Amino acid sequence: MMHLAFLVLLCLPVCSAYPLSGAAKEEDSNKDLAQQYLEKYYNLEKDVKQFRRKDSNLIVKKIQGMQKFLGLEVTGKLDTDTLEVMRKPRCGVPDVGHFSSFPGMPKWRKTHLTYRIVNYTPDLPRDAVDSAIEKALKVWEEVTPLTFSRLYEGEADIMISFAVKEHGDFYSFDGPGHSLAHAYPPGPGLYGDIHFDDDEKWTEDASGTNLFLVAAHELGHSLGLFHSANTEALMYPLYNSFTELAQFRLSQDDVNGIQSLYGPPPASTEEPLVPTKSVPSGSEMPAKCDPALSFDAISTLRGEYLFFKDRYFWRRSHWNPEPEFHLISAFWPSLPSYLDAAYEVNSRDTVFIFKGNEFWAIRGNEVQAGYPRGIHTLGFPPTIRKIDAAVSDKEKKKTYFFAADKYWRFDENSQSMEQGFPRLIADDFPGVEPKVDAVLQAFGFFYFFSGSSQFEFDPNARMVTHILKSNSWLHC
């Protein structure tokens, strides 16, 4: 009898250790995910037993708070939509407050800030990382009095680095997906710094995690902004891969938040662009949303985009999303209409306008003295009587001129045409239409306009990544 009892005792641990069913395992996994998520982003105290009690009012309230903040149906339950959102990639900063700012509204007490890129991800060329960070800084610079300059050594206000797992700040990264990056609010030392998880696949486009978008979001934190519950805002905590990076601009929610800390940008000390006469009405005027619309020339000017067509141009800026429509002669009475090409050299604060075998230089509203000049003074051969398009690469200080199926490259530093040109457009810009009407550089891409289409060209991958309608820049 004792022998039988001993067998029964031996069996008890075995019988109580049957594996959980698939559904039970999944439920436990979901609870673990939710517990970690709410602890990390919604200030839930670490208490496993409490979380396992289904009727815990605190847990229900935390889930409801998360659902409300992220725009989900507020059920207080770990439903499918809630769990799906918990698995999405996002910023590693908690969602514990309103969009406006961190508790106590920390802000920088100065308007000129320094930044330093401490190290680089192996996923991208160094110049691509530099460009993404510069563009992200410009997003906030354009709507505030803030300015930024780069340091290459020493301690900057904003130290930017790539790291994996535990990296010395008590906020470990978690591998690919989930937490993409985190940043600290304004202040000394670690404060203001940005850390990117280098286990992510960082890209210039939407094929992986877009570095520009994440950097712009994290910079919002470095400047004092917290997360926004507005799903259209850059400061919304979940990563949103904009399919059309060319169309990116801050939401009004983002602008309101950052300007509540620093105010709007100061009025320009330069002459504002003011038209001298209004646009006449008439059927000959181009319609911005005409599906067949093409452009004569495109240029940037002091942070704005100018799209020229016939006697007119559209003017688009980040701070005024609705394009303005003007006569060319209303701003520059001495310039011709029906232009061939235009481009800006940022370092000289000058836009160059081309028509036929002549070109003009403008700064703001002023056409510069000594113009027009002949295009052959730039180094073109006598056989070239006009150019079709031009664009200046501000990082490389090179200007590209396109004529028929060839292009030339001009060095802005030496002010001379480079040797080895012209070259065939098809050889160096594969996939682009040979007849180029205009070219624009933005967001790390070149946009080649040909008729009613534009070709988004990635210069690092040397390939066309998107084909869009030319007037998509005008919100059509």
Swiss-Prot record:
It holds the Pfam family Hemopexin. The lineage of its organism: Eukaryota, Metazoa, Chordata, Craniata, Vertebrata. Zn(2+) binds at C91. The active site is at E218. Belongs to the peptidase M10A family. Can degrade fibronectin, gelatins of type I, III, IV, and V; weakly collagens III, IV, and V. Activates procollagenase. Keywords: Calcium, Collagen degradation, Disulfide bond, Extracellular matrix, Hydrolase, Metal-binding, Metalloprotease, Protease, Repeat, Secreted, Signal, Zinc, Zymogen. One of its GO terms (molecular function) is serine-type endopeptidase activity. Residues 1-17 form the signal peptide. Its main location: secreted. Residues 18-98 form a propeptide. It comes from the Eukaryota. CDD domains: HX, ZnMc_MMP. A motif (Cysteine switch) lies at residues 89-96. It is an enzyme of class 3 (hydrolase). It comes from Homo sapiens (Human). It catalyses: Similar to stromelysin 1, but action on collagen types III, IV and V is weak. Transmembrane segments: none annotated. GO terms for biological process: collagen catabolic process; extracellular matrix disassembly; extracellular matrix organization; proteolysis. Its EC number is 3.4.24.22. It is found in: Secreted, Extracellular space, Extracellular matrix. This is Stromelysin-2. Its cofactor is Zn(2+); Ca(2+).
